[in-house]
Amino acid sequence: MHKEQDKKRLATLTLAALGVVYGDIGTSPLYSIKEVFGGAHHPVPITPDNVLGILSLFFWSLIIVVTLKYVSFIMRANNRGEGGIIALMTLAMHKGVAGSWQQKMLVLLGLFGAALFYGDGIITPAISVLSAVEGLEILTPAFKPYILPITLITLIGLFIFQRRGTASVGALFGPVMVIWFAVIAVLGAAAIVENPAVLAAVNPVHAFHFLTGNSLLGFFALGAVVLCITGGEALYADMGHFGAKPIQYAWLGYVLPALLLNYFGQGALLLADPSSVENPFYLLAPEWGRYPLVALATVATVIASQAVISGAFSITQQAIQLGYTPRLEIQHTSDEEIGQIYLPAINWMMLIAIIALVIEFGSSSNLAAAYGIAVTGTMLITNILAIAVAVRLWNWSPARAMLGALPFICIDLGFFLANSVKIADGGWFPLAFGLAVFILLTTWKRGRELLGLRLAADAMQLKSFVVDIAGSGIGRVPGTAIFMTPDPELVPHAMLHSLKHYKALHEQVVVMSVKVFDVPYVPDVDRVEVHRLSNNFSQVVVQYGFKDDPDIPAALALCGEAGLAIEPMDTSFFLGRETLIPKLGSEMAYWRELLFVAMFRNAGSATAFFKIPSNRVVELGSQVVL
């Protein structure tokens, strides 16, 4: 009985994974082969040897980078089931010495990898939807003037829809992608039957001969070949939603065969009719099937874009929890799925950037020049973080870890260098976008550290303060006061201000701090730690993981089990509200101080972020010179 239930659950999760995980890599056939042989930058001449060489590169890239590296190796490095660059970074930092150069380097690498993800996430919806809609031009040139408007309308509609969540339509994503992969597999298989010679490309000798025989052109071609593996990192990033097995089963049993059949089918078509390089994906289909194929491709690319958008929301939430990003408004779009969230600020930022991209580049071929460098950069960083995990957590020797990762590093480095020559043609965009995000992340983290040091410099130790207060005869007023503070060992500034103004304290005083651990979730049984400092002074530490949704009222309800009863209607929350003043000659560059101050002013309120009832909050201001 249990085995049947497990099989049913596995099948359900595998179907769901098809609709989320494989949208990006699954829509790559729309433009990958076309870009290699018909792209605007360094197109490869269509000859039998070149076609077999490129198909061989596609085949072995999917086998080595996606199947061996991600499915077999990187997926083992999961943080309690969670994957993705942030989860990998936190995992790599385990057993490290806090503040050491190694830890700082791992953080910088992880943050830069996350920043590159945003650069990649901007391009994916643009190139995917644009390449799907470009199929209309194959049907009739009369559609050409409408390709950009249709693309923009589709993308704008997708982003406007985000605030409603995907709960209502998410169930359709899996079945649609099942149909998509079945269709592209059948189209490819039909072309292979006409020209089965392309199957010889499975032999890696063809890839080797292509690279050695074409030297510089072969190197440039790698910049387009990499398009077939973009989206491969999603297999690892989405582990937390579906688990490793459903993702692995879907890849090996369905997605990989469908992709290979389609790529080899496009190669067979090019050998039979080199003029089909105009758009080999759509020309695989019979004329009567091209309109439905454009419609199906558009839906598939919207699903692919949705996965990237959801990924951006998720990674931002993790960055907020870990203190790398200011608090932003987070809306939950599903009562059942905790992971379905909507961040308005990220949503509109991405939409504006994507609209600018589509208008500026104008075609999927032009956008392909911008695509790839962010993906390969993230893949390289993933290798380095995985080495740290292997050494620190799996107890591998550094030599064994380096040796195991070396083939993947060499391949990813080759792809990265091939894409770096396209920086002037558009590759600058994801790099510039990623660098801007990286500066924001690191500036916020460093600024928070400086602010903490300034506040701590003037603070008193909480335990000695409690002893002094006990014998001071300070008046007491009814109720409970909760003072939020980043450091539970120090007296909150808000408490000192309150005491200065009111000359009294509440009957029950709680000093509360929130601590985020480098694990995805903290169970409720470990949510709160309560320490009684005296009869009416308590210290509470609320503990969350980087994917938990902070909820202070819910945490307070758990305090009762730890012996601290708090009546919500008799409770007031006291929060500090600092006004920051930048200072020349500080530990941080002045321009970064100005940036941090601007971010600090525009950060979301702690009241909303921690779900504290606004009518129970008192904010006490102070000035802090950085």
Swiss-Prot record:
One of its GO terms (cellular component) is plasma membrane. GO terms for molecular function: potassium ion transmembrane transporter activity; symporter activity. It is found in: Cell inner membrane. The chain crosses the membrane at residues 10-30, 51-71, 107-127, 141-161, 173-193, 216-236, 251-271, 293-313, 341-361, 371-391, 401-421, 423-443. It comes from the Bacteria. InterPro entries: K+_transporter, K_trans_C, K_trans_N, Kup. It holds the Pfam family K_trans. Keywords: Cell inner membrane, Cell membrane, Ion transport, Membrane, Potassium, Potassium transport, Symport, Transmembrane, Transmembrane helix, Transport. It catalyses: K(+)(in) + H(+)(in) = K(+)(out) + H(+)(out). It is a multi-pass membrane protein. Transport of potassium into the cell. Likely operates as a K(+):H(+) symporter. Belongs to the HAK/KUP transporter (TC 2.A.72) family. HAMAP family: Kup. This is Probable potassium transport system protein Kup 3. It comes from Dechloromonas aromatica (strain RCB). The lineage of its organism: Bacteria, Pseudomonadati, Pseudomonadota, Betaproteobacteria, Rhodocyclales.
